Regions:
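Positively charged n-region of N-terminal signal peptides that target proteins for export
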Residues: 1-4, 86
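Mature catalytic domains of secreted/periplasmic carbohydrate-active enzymes
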Residues: 16-427
Length: 427
């Protein structure tokens, strides 16, 4: 614990001079307006079809795991179709795994041959193909990058995971960090404009010196507008530009990941899976419904956060039809109701059991997700000029009473989300 506290203090001291550039501040504004992104967990682990943690969970050694790339040949990978699918769903950015915890690079890295170009029969740079397509279709691309590495021998001393990989009990930690920074330099100089870096894995060695100021400084020097975030489950470090929450809304801790996290002032994001797995799992049929996912997106917006929704492509490069169909349905809803999500911030009424509110200048959107009564009582909202149902324009009666505002909700409400638009002066 003492070492961990020292790490926090040292990192803060080293990064305390970080001043976001105007480009970075503009990127943060764009990010908060975008609201909805596609998360992609794809790597050599998809060959086994048992999720991205299979190497650790099944205690597979490096020697055995290195046999997998020979079977990874995603000839049906179509980056244009992936990007079109994301845009059809109403998503504004894509975050893809450049390297997950197994250390396998999904681009042609020059730092080792443990990558898709050198080790697989595919021999193509998947990240370059996707980056080029994102630029063509006008959607931002972020890279998820694991700081944790179960393959590299210099990731030493070992952390909490990957202890059965069969690596020698020796290594050079600073050499590993140099390796990681050199890979990041490749990603930030060879793939055009990048939206940001989504770090993960620092929780594996919370007492280590991760040289965060140096790594974050490298990113900002190469691409000042690139946003840095880390899934470390702690309050944000100086040098970070957005804060994420894994499988939880900001301020919640239903999954146990966010117990030491505090909601800060940075842009927020929550990520979630469409079934139970991040990486492709052929046995996982626990698909979330379209209603569940739309309501999670709406709740995220009401909590002033983005929603990053994950797919785990198959080893052949295709995305499961169940995912494609659900994303299309979400996109159809966003096409009709996106006004109440895009470009909004959390509304004046804090999240309630019945739903959430969002807002933008001149308008408050009341998202009624679960409420059967005719009357909905809100805290006092002054200067409300009118209320209508989004889409139909049906008028909604508004009553100002002592200490509150009452809405008389219409019959035949939407089972997913009845959105009431309040036109309000002074907002």
């Amino acid at each position: 614990m003492k070492q961990f506290l020292l790490m926090l203090l040292a990192s803060a001291a080293m990064a305390q001079n970080y001043q976001p550039t105007p480009e970075n501040l503009n990127a943060r504004q764009w990010f908060q307006d975008a609201k909805f992104g596609l998360f992609i967990h794809w790597g050599v682990y998809s060959v086994l079809g048992r999720g991205e943690w299979v190497m650790n969970n099944e205690k597979i050694t490096v020697a055995d795991y290195e046999k997998l790339p020979a079977q990874f040949n995603p000839t049906e990978f179509n980056p244009a179709a992936w990007v079109a699918m994301a845009k059809d769903a109403g998503m504004k950015y894509i975050t893809i795994t450049s390297k997950h915890h197994d250390g396998f690079a999904m681009w042609g890295t020059k730092q080792s041959d443990w990558d898709i170009v050198d080790r697989t029969p595919y021999h193509q740079d998947a990240l370059k193909m996707l980056a080029d397509e994102c630029h063509r279709q006008g959607i931002k691309l972020f890279f998820y990058h694991s700081q944790l590495d179960w393959h590299n021998p210099d990731y030493f001393p070992r952390g909490r995971t990957g202890v059965n990989s069969g690596r020698p009990e020796q290594g050079d930690w600073n050499k590993y960090l140099d390796y990681m920074d050199n890979q990041l330099r490749e990603l930030l100089t060879g793939y055009g404009e990048i939206g940001g870096i989504w770090f993960d894995g620092m929780w594996d060695k919370p007492d280590a010196d991760w040289r965060l100021a140096r790594t974050y400084g490298l990113i900002h020097s190469l691409q000042p507008a690139a946003m840095v975030g880390s899934n470390h489950h702690l309050k944000p470090f100086d040098g970070e530009d957005f804060q994420m929450f894994e499988k939880d809304l900001p301020g919640k801790n239903t999954t146990g990941f966010s117990g030491r996290s505090e909601v800060g002032a940075l842009p927020l994001e929550t990520c979630e899976t469409m079934n139970d797995a991040w990486g492709y799992n052929s046995n996982d049929k626990h698909f979330k419904s379209t209603t569940q996912l739309i309501q999670y997106l709406v709740k995220a917006a009401g909590n002033n956060a983005n929603f990053l929704l994950n797919v785990g492509p198959m080893p052949n490069g295709k995305i499961q039809p169940e995912f494609v169909q659900t994303l299309h349905a979400v996109g159809d809803w966003m096409g009709r109701n996106g006004e109440s999500v895009y470009g909004t911030r959390g509304g004046p009424v804090t999240p309630r059991p019945w739903g959430v509110t969002t807002q933008k200048p001149g308008k408050i959107y009341v998202h009624v997700l679960d409420w059967s009564d005719e009357l909905l009582a809100l805290p006092k909202l002054a200067n409300v000029r009118s209320a209508t149902v989004l889409g139909s324009g049906q008028k909604v009666e508004v009553q100002q009473v002592d200490g509150g505002t009452l809405l008389r909700l219409p019959a035949g409400r939407d089972a997913v989300d009845t959105v009431i638009v309040l036109a309000a002066d002074g907002r």
